[in-house]
Amino acid sequence: MARVKTGVVRRRRHKKVLKLARGFYSGRRKHFRKAKEQLERSLVYAYRDRRRKKRDFRRLWIVRINAACRLNDISYSKFINGLKKAGIELDRKILADLAMNDAAAFAKIADAAKKAL
């Protein structure tokens, strides 16, 4: 029985890893072992940050809404409470967009929240 060498399989495996490592810096792009180690780390970071991105954007939206609320003489927590009592169901993403791009509309919503309190 002939001896099976890993030539083709190894080359395919190395090419796959090195293709995914494009854009990495220096030897982490060119050397298989370093590229493989960095790729494993990169995939861990990507997995973690796909979950973290949701939290980060929510925090950003809250900061923007809070800043706009302060301009309209109401705190963020009272604003959100007023929205719930007024029956206004806008999520934080939409509210943050209004706060940044349409201050007049946000002011009307803030007034409605104040009246509901």
Curated annotation (Swiss-Prot):
Annotated GO MF terms: rRNA binding; structural constituent of ribosome
GO cellular component: a single term: ribonucleoprotein complex
GO process annotations (BP): ribosomal large subunit assembly; translation
A UniProt-annotated Pfam family: Ribosomal_L20
Keyword annotations: Ribonucleoprotein, Ribosomal protein, RNA-binding, rRNA-binding
Superkingdom of the organism of origin: Bacteria
InterPro entries: Ribosomal_bL20, RIBOSOMAL_L20_CS, Ribosomal_protein_bL20_C
Family statement: Belongs to the bacterial ribosomal protein bL20 family.
General function of this protein: Binds directly to 23S ribosomal RNA and is necessary for the in vitro assembly process of the 50S ribosomal subunit. It is not involved in the protein synthesizing functions of that subunit.
Protein name per the record: Large ribosomal subunit protein bL20
Annotated gene: rplT
